[in-house]
């Protein structure tokens, strides 16, 4: 059965040709706005990493990476889930100074993703990472960076509306900040997803903070790997999707673990076996720079600004027959 939802009366605002122009416009303009706002430089990034390196992102802990052997180099490789750990190592290798960072065009395969209007097994992100000082590992610094990112999104959307007058997406620049515990306290009888919808429906642009650790209910709001974000200094940028009428995550980000928070979170997550991996050893010994970073979904941003109802309208992927048939019946072209 298809999990696709098609809003009543929905139709594409642009022809396929104009849609491709709009996607190019968004990607070109946003990466410029983002790099200027956060002082980032574009770098090349890997599609796969060695399994033994520990550099792949374990996401929520259950997703299986796409793996393959490379006989000529006697190694097992994994297609990346994200570049969260690779970026931090790259900042050290490339000798970035405090206040400067990098961004990449990240392409990933998440084979265990449950596909629907918003989710695909193909993931495309602007992955970014920045060197910070120890005194910048604060909630205030995190909030300032969130506001900078939201500003870059809104500036791009404003420019898109001028270039493509048939597009009318309105985005809220003012960010409402709330922790996952505060959100649970406000809506104790709702599921995490229902809580997100309720708060974003009210405030339109929300940064939901402190994701990964257990709440008073005994459950985390959502899963986070223990070895990249500091669970006290991270969060998701959520915007209201006018087409689907739901909370719409465009970015997961945070200040990264230092030696103490990595040590604590590995124990809490039952992942002490990772301490012997090369990346984790370097981090625990203080050999990597202190950083913050995140991923910003390219297809998600395009969906939001162009006003499409399915992510397959702005990216090429593979879909089940029920989804293809439902979209075809509604006149929706999946790329």
Placement of each model-derived feature along the sequence:
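A translation/RNA-centric and nucleic-acid-associated enzymatic feature enriched
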Residues: 109, 180-335
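Extracellular structured ligand-interaction cores
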Residues: 100-102, 123-127, 203-205, 245-247
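Extended, charged alpha-beta segments that form solvent-exposed binding/catalytic grooves
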Residues: 104-190, 194
